[in-house]
Amino acid sequence: MRWSAYWTRALARRLIRRLLAGDGGDRLQPRWLPRRWVTVVSGDIDPDAGVAVLWVVSRPGHESAVSYSMAFERCGEEWTSTGGGSSSSDAAAVRRRLPVGSTGQLGMIELGGGGGCPSRAHLLQHPDDWMSAPWVGSNTLQVAAEVDHLVVGERRIEVPANGTLVVAWKAPPSTVRGGVRPRIAAIGADGTELAVLGPRDQMDSHTWARVLGD
């Protein structure tokens, strides 16, 4: 409970400020915060859409390690939590990045878990208008070593050294439960588009090509 309160009220707010200042990717870990206590796995923010997501692991490498994720939306001047989760795993903190096609990294972009909810900012202004509320969502991704960065919708997102990250997004109102995730493209160091994960895809285009080729 103590950690949960600190995570939501103090650390998360500091990390959001760092994201707003442009300190994403591997720069998101505060220098004053030892990784052996808390490892900041990933964070993402879309200031224009007013959405953010954070992922940290407490006590990585220890039997009591816990992974925490939490999504946020800007409501007025405040960043408000829209939900999150935890699990007894530190895999994201200790994972090393793997080349595509290897055991544990079949595709350029591996889609992990995700979640979301109707926009709270919209519902604060229009409490009875659920049908017109945008969807605020997030997803975890595992990216191959060949990928330099991602393009999520129109945004460029840096990939952390271990290739594991979270992305935040906001989608227009939709009849599809859970909203429609934006297009995600994996880009190589030379600017080549290596693979695409479409809005409704569970596998990226590189993986599909290998499956159909076999």
Question: Language-model features: where?
Answer:
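Serine/threonine-biased, Pro/acidic-interspersed low-complexity stretches characteristic
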Residues: M1-Q142, T175-D214
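Short proline/glycine-enriched turn/loop motifs at strand-loop junctions of beta-rich domains
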Residues: Q142-D148
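Short, surface-exposed beta-strand/strand-loop-strand elements in extracellular ectodomains
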Residues: H149-E154
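Glycine-centered loop-to-beta-strand initiation motif
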Residues: R156-S174, G191
